[in-house]
């Protein structure tokens, strides 16, 4: 039952991530990579902070009515986990957005980037196997299917059909593999809090890079308000939190 619950959470997370690729592609034509990821991360962190405040208020009210004390939790491990997850996510999301922006006009950047990013599913299974975890036979089939799909997507037209964005997409998948495994290591922490902290970390790092490399005009940010808001709330705020919560019940591989 718990595994089914985790799978449903991860399914909804995948849905929100998939729909966000369109927003990411739109934003790549309007603002820089670090600007977009910094902005969406801050929006996501703010959304989750409000959720944490609301949930804390409800817990206190419930404790007041029942007369039971509010359960205290150690925040140290959650903060450490959130910062580590945020650092890995910084590389993953910015490589992903850079890859989308790197594709030439006319190339289906959303589809290519989405598929290449999703190869982290196979990478996680492979890494888990290397770490001594017994893998189901279907994983080996998935590896060959994935490799075949990558060839058809990137190499069916020869070397000329291979783009720099494809390489960035694969590097992004490697980073997302690291993120999945890091989340799994801290799966005993509060899902919403660790997600909020990871996006504060990702947001701060991305905004520092934005100030150094991009320095966008306010008009550019205003033009990209919808992709930023959509990605910030639905992808960063909701989907990644569902991922962290779902991994408590489902095997990362």
Question: Model-derived features: where do they sit?
Answer:
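Glycine-/small-residue-enriched transmembrane alpha-helix faces in small-molecule transporters
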Residues: 1-39, 87, 91, 95, ...
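Cytoplasmic-side transmembrane-helix entry/capping segments in multi-pass membrane proteins
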Residues: 10, 77-84, 135-147, 165-169, ...
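Helix-helix packing/entry segments at the starts of transmembrane helices
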Residues: 14, 39, 113-119, 182-203, ...
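Specific transmembrane alpha-helical segments of multi-pass solute transporters/efflux pumps
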Residues: 20, 56-116, 150-152, 232-250
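Membrane-interface helix termini and inter-helical loops of multi-pass transporters
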Residues: 22-33, 98-106, 151-164, 210-228
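Transmembrane alpha-helices of multi-pass small-molecule transport proteins
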Residues: 30-91, 121-127, 175-179, 196-214, ...
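Specific alpha-helical transmembrane segments that line the substrate/conduction pathway
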Residues: 35-46, 93-133, 172, 252-253
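Hydrophobic transmembrane alpha-helices of multi-pass small-molecule transport proteins
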Residues: 48, 135-155, 172-174, 206
């Amino acid at each position: 039952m718990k595994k089914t619950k985790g799978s449903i959470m991860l399914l909804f997370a995948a849905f929100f991530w998939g729909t966000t690729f369109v927003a990411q592609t739109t934003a790549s034509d309007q603002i820089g990579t670090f600007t977009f990821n910094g902005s969406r991360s801050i929006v996501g962190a703010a959304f989750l902070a409000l959720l944490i405040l609301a949930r804390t208020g409800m817990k206190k009210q419930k404790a007041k009515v029942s007369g039971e004390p509010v359960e205290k939790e150690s925040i140290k491990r959650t903060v450490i986990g959130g910062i580590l997850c945020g650092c890995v996510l910084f590389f993953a999301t910015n490589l992903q957005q850079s890859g989308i922006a790197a594709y030439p006009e006319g190339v289906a950047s959303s589809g290519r980037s989405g598929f290449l990013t999703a190869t982290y599913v196979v990478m996680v299974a492979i890494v888990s196997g290397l770490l001594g975890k017994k893998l189901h036979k279907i994983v080996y089939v998935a590896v060959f299917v994935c490799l075949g799909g990558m060839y058809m997507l990137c190499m069916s037209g020869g070397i000329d059909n291979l783009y720099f964005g494809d390489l960035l997409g694969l590097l992004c998948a490697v980073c997302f593999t690291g993120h999945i495994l890091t989340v799994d290591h801290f799966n005993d922490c509060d899902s919403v809090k660790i997600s909020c902290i990871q996006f504060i970390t990702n947001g701060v790092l991305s905004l520092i890079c934005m100030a150094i490399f991009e320095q966008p005009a306010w008009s550019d940010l205003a033009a990209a308000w919808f992709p930023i808001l959509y990605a910030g709330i639905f992808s960063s705020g909701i989907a990644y939190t569902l991922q962290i919560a779902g991994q408590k019940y489902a095997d990362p591989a």
